[in-house]
């Protein structure tokens, strides 16, 4: 189950079920006749935090929302659980999740007792979160332990807004050059070239023959479907069943804001959309070339 909330900057917040589990984080049996003190060091928050940004990469699927390799951020995690017949709830904010805070505790363990520290761990798309919460239990040595039980575990994650084919307006940005695909007039045809303006919009369509790229900024009415010319230039033509107007994307549906894709032409099957410094334009479809392009949802 999942629910979503549309946010600014091309992202949406989605609530999803995640896996959480109580584990034995630390245990000590004091078989002596006097109390002992033990120092416990723990890390609360994200496990193996190694990114300068909050963007993570899914290493396994998460319902219908995340696929392996998809980028996402964790906004919060909430878990309800039962311990000693009492129901409780605990949550972590984004700041707490990403902090990876190292904490030291000193505990006193009575004689002939066992100390057990239960830790609540969560997994969100392959990212481990340690010590969401902890419960300390002191029992007689050999006595049965009261293991906490997870009732429900949910996370709010930030993912790129879904690109709905035939509907969502997008920008197409060259991943390496960080310039946008724009449309200019060349030889009395609308033609694709890179530029700094982010005002040029496109819509992706799909039919039985492949993906189609429609410009919303043609200067020649009706000439709006991207195709590869025989010389490799990218122009916009009237709609037809010409396979030169069809493209294969490197990423499976659904597409989302921020996805990085390549475009391979369905007529020139060994050629892909790329940057090349031409005489008047610099977006081409060339053999054995498939540059990476970033899809950005236009906020409406």
From Swiss-Prot:
Keywords: Antibiotic, Antimicrobial, Cytolysis, Disulfide bond, Hemolysis, Ion transport, Membrane, Secreted, Target cell membrane, Target membrane, Toxin, Transmembrane, Transport. GO terms for biological process: defense response to bacterium; killing of cells of another organism; monoatomic ion transport. The record marks 189 as: Crucial for binding sphingomyelin and important for inducing hemolysis. Residues 159-299 are annotated as: C-terminal receptor-binding domain. An N-(acyl)-sphingosylphosphocholine binds at residues 187, 229, 235, 284. GO terms for molecular function: toxin activity. Disulfide bonds join 274-285. Binds to sphingomyelin as a monomer by using its C-terminal domain. Forms a nonamer when sphingomyelin/LRP-1 ratio is lower than ca 500. Oligomerization, but not binding, is influenced by the fluidity of sphingomyelin. Belongs to the lysenin family. SUPFAM superfamilies: Aerolisin/ETX pore-forming domain. Expressed by coelomocytes. It comes from the Eukaryota. Pore-forming toxin that specifically binds sphingomyelin in the plasma membrane of various cells. Has hemolytic activity. Binding and hemolytic activities of this toxin are 10 times less than those of lysenin and lysenin-related protein 2. It comes from Eisenia fetida. This is Lysenin-related protein 1. It is found in: Secreted; Target cell membrane. The record marks 22, 247, 293 as: Crucial for binding sphingomyelin and inducing hemolysis. The keyword Glycoprotein does not apply. Residues 12-35, 110-158 are annotated as: N-terminal cap domain. Residues 36-109 are annotated as: Beta-hairpin domain. One of its GO terms (cellular component) is other organism cell membrane.
């Amino acid at each position: 189950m999942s629910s979503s909330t549309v946010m600014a900057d091309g992202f949406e917040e989605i609530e999803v079920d995640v896996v959480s589990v109580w584990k034995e984080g630390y245990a000590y049996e004091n078989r002596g006749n006097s109390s002992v003190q033990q120092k416990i060091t723990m890390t609360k928050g994200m496990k193996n935090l190694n990114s300068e940004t909050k963007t993570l990469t899914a290493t396994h699927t998460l319902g219908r929302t995340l696929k392996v390799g998809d980028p996402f951020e964790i906004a919060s995690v909430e878990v309800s659980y039962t311990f000693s017949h009492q129901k409780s709830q605990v949550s972590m904010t984004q700041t707490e999740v990403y902090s990876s805070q190292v904490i030291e505790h000193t505990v006193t363990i009575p004689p002939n007792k066992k100390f057990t520290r239960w830790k609540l761990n969560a997994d969100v798309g392959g990212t481990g979160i340690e010590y969401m919460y902890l419960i300390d239990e002191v029992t007689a040595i050999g006595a049965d332990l009261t293991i906490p039980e997870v009732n429900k575990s949910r996370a709010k994650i930030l993912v790129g807004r879904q690109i709905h084919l035939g509907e969502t307006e997008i920008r197409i940005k060259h991943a390496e050059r960080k310039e946008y695909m724009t449309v200019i007039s060349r030889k009395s045809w609308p033609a694709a070239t890179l530029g700094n303006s982010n005002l040029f919009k496109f819509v992706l369509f799909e039919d039985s023959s492949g993906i189609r790229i429609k410009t919303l900024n043609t200067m020649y009415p009706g000439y709006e479907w991207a195709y590869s010319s025989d010389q490799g230039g990218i122009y916009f033509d009237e709609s037809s069943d010409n396979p030169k107007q069809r493209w294969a994307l490197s990423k499976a549906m659904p597409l989302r804001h921020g996805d990085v894709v390549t475009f391979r032409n369905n007529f020139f099957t060994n050629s892909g959309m790329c940057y090349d410094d031409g005489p008047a334009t610099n977006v081409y479809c060339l053999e054995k070339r498939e540059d990476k392009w970033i899809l950005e949802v236009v906020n409406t």
